[in-house]
Amino acid sequence: MDKKTARLSRSKRTRIKLRELGHTRLCVYRTPRHVYAQVISGDGSTVLVAASTVEKDVKAKCKYTGNVESAAIVGEIIANRCKEKGISQVAFDRSGYKYHGRVKALAEAAREHGLQF
């Protein structure tokens, strides 16, 4: 089993558990150049809030979009957008990635700005 297949099987396992519980989840996806975050409803059918380093306002704030600082900016933006929509509590879906680096920075920035995991 290669790295990508192992990550996908880990993510599938956690998503099944989160869907059974019916919690709204903060889903993270990363590429070498960008970080994406979405808040998805409990049934998994609709995206309620989204933010990424592809957006112009995020690109203006950071020099490079594939690092820890830009992931923290995305975490801050996603938390603020959740507040506007009235979402205060989510389950963190790290998509099979290790809780380290950009994933950790995004999660901690979202927590600091009022989002509860």
UniProtKB/Swiss-Prot annotation:
Top-level division of the source organism's lineage: Bacteria
Sequence intervals crossing the membrane: none
Keywords noted in UniProt: Ribonucleoprotein, Ribosomal protein, RNA-binding, rRNA-binding
Any GO BP: translation
Cystine crosslinks: none
Pfam families (UniProt xref): Ribosomal_L18p
SUPFAM superfamilies membership: Translational machinery components
Entry GO CC: cytosolic large ribosomal subunit
A Gene Ontology molecular function term of the record: 5S rRNA binding
Keyword Flavoprotein carried by entry: no
Role description: This is one of the proteins that bind and probably mediate the attachment of the 5S RNA into the large ribosomal subunit, where it forms part of the central protuberance.
Similarity remark: Belongs to the universal ribosomal protein uL18 family.
Summary of subunit composition and partner proteins: Part of the 50S ribosomal subunit; part of the 5S rRNA/L5/L18/L25 subcomplex. Contacts the 5S and 23S rRNAs.
Designated name of the protein: Large ribosomal subunit protein uL18
Species name: Francisella tularensis subsp. novicida (strain U112)
Name of the gene encoding the protein in the UniProt record: rplR
